[in-house]
């Protein structure tokens, strides 16, 4: 059998970018960096974390300076007026 053909197997610390915890594993790679580990991943912790990203609507509103006050009123105020007119129509019959 040939000598020195297998890669060197070492114990390496896997470092998590989110929580900073390091987990020792055996591998042939010299270093491993991961985004989330079992210590901080929402599936294992049960906690929900949301990454807030600006979507296309937010980008549009920011570009044209539209604020929450300037947005269109909802239909609910219009529905109240419609209910009153329906009641008035019934009374007038």
From Swiss-Prot:
Residues 72-93 are annotated as: Disordered. GO terms for cellular component: ribonucleoprotein complex; ribosome. The lineage of its organism: Bacteria, Bacillati, Mycoplasmatota, Mollicutes, Acholeplasmatales. It comes from Onion yellows phytoplasma (strain OY-M). Part of the 50S ribosomal subunit. The keyword Cytoplasm does not apply. Residues 81-93 have a biased composition (Basic and acidic residues). This is Large ribosomal subunit protein bL31. PANTHER family: 50S RIBOSOMAL PROTEIN L31, CHLOROPLASTIC, LARGE RIBOSOMAL SUBUNIT PROTEIN BL31C. Keywords: Ribonucleoprotein, Ribosomal protein, RNA-binding, rRNA-binding. It holds the Pfam family Ribosomal_L31. One of its GO terms (biological process) is translation. GO terms for molecular function: rRNA binding; structural constituent of ribosome. Belongs to the bacterial ribosomal protein bL31 family. Type A subfamily. Binds the 23S rRNA. The keyword Magnesium does not apply.
């Amino acid at each position: 059998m040939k000598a020195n053909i297998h890669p060197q197997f070492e114990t390496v610390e896997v470092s998590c970018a989110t929580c900073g915890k390091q987990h020792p594993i055996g591998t042939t790679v010299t270093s491993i960096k991961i985004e989330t580990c079992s210590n901080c991943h929402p599936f294992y912790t049960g906690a929900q974390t949301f990454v807030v990203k600006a979507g296309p609507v937010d980008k549009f509103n920011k570009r044209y300076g539209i604020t929450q006050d300037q947005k269109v009123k909802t239909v609910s105020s219009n529905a109240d007026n419609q209910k009153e007119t329906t009641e008035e129509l019934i009374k007038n019959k």
